[in-house]
Amino acid sequence: MHKELTIENFKCFSEPTTITLGKINICLGCNSVGKSSVIQSFILIRQAFEKARLFKDTQVKKYHIQLNDIYGLQLGDSEHIKSSKVKDDITLKLDEYEYKLMSIAESPMEMEAANEYDVSVQSLREGIFSDGFYYLNAERTGPRNYQMIDSKTINHCGVYGENTMHLLNVLGTVSRVDSERCYNLDEGKTVSTLNKQVEYWMDYIIPGIEIRTDDVLELRVSKMTLRQPALDTDFLSPYNFGFGISYVLPIIVTGLIAERGSMILVENPEAHLHPKGQSHIGYFLAVMACSGIQVIVETHSEHVLNGIRIAALKNKVAPDDISINFFSLKKEGKNTRHMVEKINLDERMNLENWPEGFLDQEEEDLRTLRLLRSKGI
């Protein structure tokens, strides 16, 4: 498990900024304060490692890192993502592994990185250097009647969840889920096949939904239909059920199939979910993290955080295994600086520090309502 990520000269992080990591890591804060930059840093490190692994038996020691169109990255020009014109490189350090990304004059949409480490040794490490690396973009695929089947063998849902239907159809009845990840909140739900465990967890997050998938190989498409047993209808198009199911399904499938010792990056798991569903997806992600997967979550939802805290208390997770990082802007004179503050938890999962702006909007709104009412408005 990785312990520490340091970012320098990348987007809003002009100075070296270190983020402590645990089994499950939550990035919280307002918009445009650096949360997504953390996710992108992991992706750039992963890409540098993959290039080094590809060329490990060659004389190539420096690699071109793509800034766009890989793992969903859309970073644009290399000069635009440096936070300082004085510094030439972007520095990303994960534990003892440090990567310096340099601009390439003739190819501004790429950067050059060297890998000074033994790739064979790195590959034995868990986390970002393991075979399993899973990333789900905030802009996941919405309701679709079908998805195209990738011509390559796939073992993940895809950055946008675009492989989810096919993967579930192929593995649903033949793949067994590790006992630590199996749904354990109902003694009657004990079948460990992937399709049943997906059904159990989906019912926990969005109650009363049944899923059916099928491949039409001659057309190279996977189909999905949904049904609510409470209604007297047959299986229907996903378009009849809104965005929540389509957005959360890849998260559930990814968590259940991810390799032990791997890493999952998830942006906005709460998207299109009711607050109860947001809490429950947080609970699910915490359970996955307890089973030996390092989870990185970028979220705006206090409900996701509370679901994680509930799971941690219920499953006796140590406070140090949960890393809550609050991203904010701090004014210092005429200047504004990006800050990352770790929010500590005690043994009872109480938040030990509560900086200004941290999940306090409800309190602010209630205060405003009281003030307006006192003025007779």
What residue ranges belong to the model's regions?
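Pre-Walker A-like glycine/lysine-rich segment at the N-terminus of P-loop NTPase domains
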Residues: M1-A48
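Phosphate-coordinating catalytic segments in nucleotide- and nucleic-acid-processing enzymes
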Residues: E4, A48-P250, T254, E259, ...
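Short, solvent-exposed loop/turn segments at secondary-structure junctions
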Residues: F10-C12, I26, V33, V60, ...
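Phosphate-binding P-loop
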Residues: P16-G22, P229-A230, L256-R260, V287-A289
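Walker B catalytic motif
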Residues: V266-P269
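C-terminal lobe/lid and adjacent interdomain/linker elements of RecA-like ASCE P-loop ATPase modules
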Residues: H280-I377
